């Protein structure tokens, strides 16, 4: 395998360059903004490309050393994509609600995970001794725990690196990571504060196509790390064809500092 490749055309096709309306911006993002068009900020993809590449390499290197990556994205349009990317790259995820203390109070979280495992075992092997109502209550408890913790059930400890979609929504996760010294890679839209994360990647954090592209790239980077760790360099994940796109940045008004 090799580190996943991508092109400027893919970023444009996915709408990575589209930020928020100009009145909904964070001034700290000025250095990553190319200009504005129809009152929408346009993100400077010339900066996104190298930062994304560096982040992908960091993910691959971390996994190659045996590290764990936690994918975090709880917004509606990111939830399923985040889970799929983590599952197919043998990593971990939080895609429902971030529970306070998920990192900083790992002992309590571990107890809840133990409860989830116990419920899995009970419902798989010991169903005869329960009434229909008791079984239904157990299933509801398991469903609730699995929704919150299913993606980190097998993580074993806090992650070595975190990848986040939407830093505004996942602010608590970022704060907890900072307290523990866990590096954070994050997609930062034009309404975000890039200073809050260790490895910011300027880009649209709302469009499903953009989120799918990011998650696919990071999943493949993790798989590359696994392949490097195991010495199995012959895995073929397939190549993504580049779709032609029309020039989109024409008539864009530059933004000056």
UniProtKB/Swiss-Prot annotation:
SUPFAM superfamilies named in the record: Ribosomal protein S2
GO MF annotations, alphabetized: structural constituent of ribosome
A Pfam family hit: Ribosomal_S2
BP terms from Gene Ontology: translation
Keywords noted in UniProt: Ribonucleoprotein, Ribosomal protein
Name this polypeptide is given: Small ribosomal subunit protein uS2
Organism of derivation: Bartonella quintana (strain Toulouse)
Coiled coil: none
InterPro entries in the record: Ribosomal_uS2 (IPR001865), Ribosomal_uS2_bac/mit/plastid (IPR005706), Ribosomal_uS2_CS (IPR018130), Ribosomal_uS2_flav_dom_sf (IPR023591)
Top-rank lineage group of the source organism: Bacteria
Family: Belongs to the universal ribosomal protein uS2 family.
GO cellular component, one term: cytosolic small ribosomal subunit
